[in-house]
Amino acid sequence: AQSVPYGISQIKAPALHSQGYTGSNVKVAVIDSGIDSSHPDLNVRGGASFVPSETNPYQDGSSHGTHVAGTIAALNNSIGVLGVAPSSALYAVKVLDSTGSGQYSWIINGIEWAISNNMDVINMSLGGPTGSTALKTVVDKAVSSGIVVAAAAGNEGSSGSTSTVGYPAKYPSTIAVGAVNSANQRASFSSAGSELDVMAPGVSIQSTLPGGTYGAYNGTSMATPHVAGAAALILSKHPTWTNAQVRDRLESTATYLGSSFYYGKGLINVQAAAQ
């Protein structure tokens, strides 16, 4: 049997599914640790690896990318879980190794691949405490080329009035995503700061894991693919909308939850965003 993870319902994705919008013809690059393409609940259409020691993008030694991918696009079938945009086209862009770490040069190469291969949405459930000029340049290039870029705000919690949002989420051109639980409370680990844009479910998120299995993870890494999937749903309903329009709709229709320093504009509501 197939279960619908709570986060899918919390962002109101099923309302769009019932209208017939499931992300068809929208290309989503999962810039991460790879995706296990043999998983029966995933359909990976392509990809590339920029990790010198791990050349196969369709293997995922850390399980992180496979989990992220399932939240975006786990198939609507009789097994496992359901993703936000189950018909969207997943691309595995490996920039993190099996320990979950990577170099900015690998990430930059992955973003360049996404631009060259006409991706519509980029999911970056990754980040670090310092940025780089080259990273900012390529992220801005992706956005100016029309791609919706969702990035994890980070799992550093809050630190008084100091921003704990990581890079690349801290760059204004990205949609910086924080995490809430099923009761719309901010996760204690979710980074805070003026750069935070929106919130999505990121606590006990059930999704796909390598080897045809499933499991629950926590993190802003789990919240971000809800936003990437939401962007794919919106674009499948409104294929002529620009990335700026998609972002504006996600932010302007979000449900207010509290101070923007901790919650950004609030919880995304993809049903309202895609009106």
Swiss-Prot record:
Any single GO BP term: sporulation resulting in formation of a cellular spore
Sorted UniProt keywords: Calcium, Hydrolase, Metal-binding, Protease, Secreted, Serine protease, Sporulation
GO molecular function ontology, one term from the record: metal ion binding
InterPro entries: Peptidase_S8/S53_dom (IPR000209), Peptidase_S8/S53_dom_sf (IPR036852), Peptidase_S8_Asp-AS (IPR023827), Peptidase_S8_His-AS (IPR022398), Peptidase_S8_Ser-AS (IPR023828), Peptidase_S8_subtilisin-like (IPR050131), Peptidase_S8_subtilisin-rel (IPR015500), Subtilisin_Carlsberg-like (IPR034202)
Active-site residues from the entry: D32, H64, S221
PROSITE patterns on file: SUBTILASE, SUBTILASE_ASP, SUBTILASE_HIS, SUBTILASE_SER
Residues that hold Ca(2+) 2 according to the record: A169, Y171, T174
Top enzyme category: hydrolase
Keyword Secreted: yes
Catalytic activity: Hydrolysis of proteins with broad specificity for peptide bonds, and a preference for a large uncharged residue in P1. Hydrolyzes peptide amides
Gene3D superfamilies: Peptidase S8/S53 domain
Function as written in the Swiss-Prot or TrEMBL entry: Subtilisin is an extracellular alkaline serine protease, it catalyzes the hydrolysis of proteins and peptide amides.
Name by which UniProt lists this protein: Subtilisin
Source organism: Bacillus pumilus (Bacillus mesentericus)
Gene that produces this protein: apr
